């Protein structure tokens, strides 16, 4: 697509949203609590901040403000305010460890962009299934495209199930005053995925082209039971237990992948 000559600022808002899920089986309350503590530490606020800062670098955004927080009993949040223009350090809010704004300037620019992540560890009360979910949103204005960080984020989070939504909102005008409701070609989020990611996941799309909304759901193809057991040795399982846990995990993953409750099905 030929580069548009715009009149003023590019007012299109491009938002890339992820829901990523990590599934595990833990057969005791202690094991489930240990898993939640483990996964909570794996995705703590410090590590997530590093991932999001790298995301900023990949999409060519400048960091204006960073806030991160770990929660009790579990969960973490990170929010980064970014822009596409070079940074004027005198106008940047710097938050210290006491969550106090050091600089006197308060940012209130509606044309700025943001990247945020929130985590949600949880477990089933009876079955032993544990699920970790992280929500990530990369929302940009101007020429910055969040799609440039798509492959990096998928690789960094190494998830069993991923749901992705990309949408473009608003419009921008060219030098002739004509409105443009999107400024690049796309018919699927999969257009921007690397070959190795496409080979790793089963995927399907639900797209609303007239609204510039694109949705892709992903399920990891490779299933090895030992990768889903927490504090359990697969060799210690009976044949019946082995089959039961596989069916339980497969049901959980399929329900999340399709977004609805289903009857117990066997993994083929």
UniProtKB/Swiss-Prot annotation:
<dbReference type="InterPro" id="IPR009165">
    <property type="entry name" value="S-AdoMet_deCO2ase_bac"/>
</dbReference>
<feature type="site" description="Cleavage (non-hydrolytic); by autolysis">
    <location>
        <begin position="112"/>
        <end position="113"/>
    </location>
</feature>
<comment type="function">
    <text>Catalyzes the decarboxylation of S-adenosylmethionine to S-adenosylmethioninamine (dcAdoMet), the propylamine donor required for the synthesis of the polyamines spermine and spermidine from the diamine putrescine.</text>
</comment>
<feature type="active site" description="Proton acceptor; for processing activity">
    <location>
        <position position="118"/>
    </location>
</feature>
<dbReference type="GO" id="GO:0008295">
    <property type="term" value="P:spermidine biosynthetic process"/>
</dbReference>
<dbReference type="InterPro" id="IPR016067">
    <property type="entry name" value="S-AdoMet_deCO2ase_core"/>
</dbReference>
<keyword id="KW-0745">Spermidine biosynthesis</keyword>
<feature type="modified residue" description="Pyruvic acid (Ser); by autocatalysis">
    <location>
        <position position="113"/>
    </location>
</feature>
<keyword id="KW-0620">Polyamine biosynthesis</keyword>
<comment type="pathway">
    <text>Amine and polyamine biosynthesis; S-adenosylmethioninamine biosynthesis; S-adenosylmethioninamine from S-adenosyl-L-methionine: step 1/1.</text>
</comment>
<comment type="similarity">
    <text>Belongs to the prokaryotic AdoMetDC family. Type 2 subfamily.</text>
</comment>
<protein>
    <recommendedName>
        <fullName>S-adenosylmethionine decarboxylase proenzyme</fullName>
        <ecNumber>4.1.1.50</ecNumber>
    </recommendedName>
</protein>
<keyword id="KW-0456">Lyase</keyword>
<feature type="active site" description="Proton donor; for catalytic activity">
    <location>
        <position position="141"/>
    </location>
</feature>
<keyword id="KW-0210">Decarboxylase</keyword>
<keyword id="KW-0670">Pyruvate</keyword>
<keyword id="KW-0949">S-adenosyl-L-methionine</keyword>
<comment type="subunit">
    <text>Heterooctamer of four alpha and four beta chains arranged as a tetramer of alpha/beta heterodimers.</text>
</comment>
<keyword id="KW-0068">Autocatalytic cleavage</keyword>
<dbReference type="GO" id="GO:0004014">
    <property type="term" value="F:adenosylmethionine decarboxylase activity"/>
</dbReference>
<dbReference type="InterPro" id="IPR003826">
    <property type="entry name" value="AdoMetDC_fam_prok"/>
</dbReference>
<dbReference type="GO" id="GO:0005829">
    <property type="term" value="C:cytosol"/>
</dbReference>
<feature type="active site" description="Schiff-base intermediate with substrate; via pyruvic acid">
    <location>
        <position position="113"/>
    </location>
</feature>
<dbReference type="Pfam" id="PF02675">
    <property type="entry name" value="AdoMet_dc"/>
</dbReference>
<keyword id="KW-0704">Schiff base</keyword>
<keyword id="KW-0865">Zymogen</keyword>
């Amino acid at each position: 697509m030929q580069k548009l000559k715009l009149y003023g600022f590019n007012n299109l808002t491009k938002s890339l949203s992820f829901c990523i899920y990590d599934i595990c089986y833990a057969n005791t309350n202690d094991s489930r609590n240990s898993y939640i503590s483990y996964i909570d530490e794996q995705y703590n606020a410090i590590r997530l901040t590093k991932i999001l800062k790298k995301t900023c670098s990949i999409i060519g955004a400048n960091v204006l403000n960073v806030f991160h927080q770990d929660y009790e009993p579990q969960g973490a949040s990170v929010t980064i305010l970014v822009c596409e223009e070079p940074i004027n350090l005198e106008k940047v809010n710097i938050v210290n460890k006491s969550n106090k704004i050091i600089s006197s300037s308060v940012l209130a620019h509606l044309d700025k962009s943001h990247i945020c992540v929130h985590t949600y560890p949880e477990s089933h009360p009876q079955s032993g299934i544990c699920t970790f979910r992280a929500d990530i949103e990369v929302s940009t204005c101007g020429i910055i495209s969040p799609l440039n960080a798509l492959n990096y984020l998928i690789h960094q989070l190494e998830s069993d199930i991923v749901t992705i939504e990309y949408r473009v909102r608003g419009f921008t005008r060219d030098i002739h005053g004509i409105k443009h409701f999107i400024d690049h070609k796309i018919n699927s989020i999969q257009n921007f995925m690397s070959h190795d990611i496409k080979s790793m996941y089963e995927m399907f799309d639900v797209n609303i082209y007239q609204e510039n909304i694109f949705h892709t759901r992903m399920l990891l193809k490779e299933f090895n039971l030992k990768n889903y057991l927490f504090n359990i040795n697969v060799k210690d399982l009976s044949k019946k237990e082995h089959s039961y846990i596989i069916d339980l995990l497969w049901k959980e993953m399929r329900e999340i992948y399709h977004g609805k409750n289903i009857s117990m099905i066997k993994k083929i």
